Amino acid sequence: MSAQASPATELQNPTLGQVYATLTRHSAQQTEFIPHIFYALHQLKNDNGHTNTFETATSNIRHRLKLCKAAIAGDAHAVEMLSRPCDEWPAVVCQKEQEIEAKKRVHRQLRQRVEEIAGPLDAAAAP
């Protein structure tokens, strides 16, 4: 990896690049929800007598979990991956990359066949 390019730009799999970009995106309005969940649980454990601490902490946890659920539900690839045990993930990613490479090979072969029949395909000549 080069020192200037982000890992997301160097990932050959666009889905992995999108996941990386989603997980590393930061803004002032949207902070990471996992630390907030742990902080809310810490507040519950060390309650200092405030009456609505429990409700505040649990509502924060519920809100962050809803954000997480919505983010996962919006991506079919994430749903598929999360339906598998974590120890299977590297094998699944490897399999998906092999499938992509096989599709690229088929595409190259089809392009070669078309060029043999119709002549070279030129992007500038295409309508």
From Swiss-Prot:
Component of the Mediator complex. Keywords: Activator, Coiled coil, Nucleus, Transcription, Transcription regulation. Its main location: nucleus. Belongs to the Mediator complex subunit 9 family. It comes from Eremothecium gossypii (strain ATCC 10895 / CBS 109.51 / FGSC 9923 / NRRL Y-1056) (Yeast). It holds the Pfam family Med9. GO terms for molecular function: structural molecule activity; transcription coactivator activity. Residues 95-119 form a coiled coil. Component of the Mediator complex, a coactivator involved in the regulated transcription of nearly all RNA polymerase II-dependent genes. Mediator functions as a bridge to convey information from gene-specific regulatory proteins to the basal RNA polymerase II transcription machinery. Mediator is recruited to promoters by direct interactions with regulatory proteins and serves as a scaffold for the assembly of a functional preinitiation complex with RNA polymerase II and the general transcription factors. GO terms for cellular component: core mediator complex; cytosol; mediator complex. It is found in: Nucleus. This is Mediator of RNA polymerase II transcription subunit 9. One of its GO terms (biological process) is positive regulation of transcription initiation by RNA polymerase II. CDD domains: Med9-C.
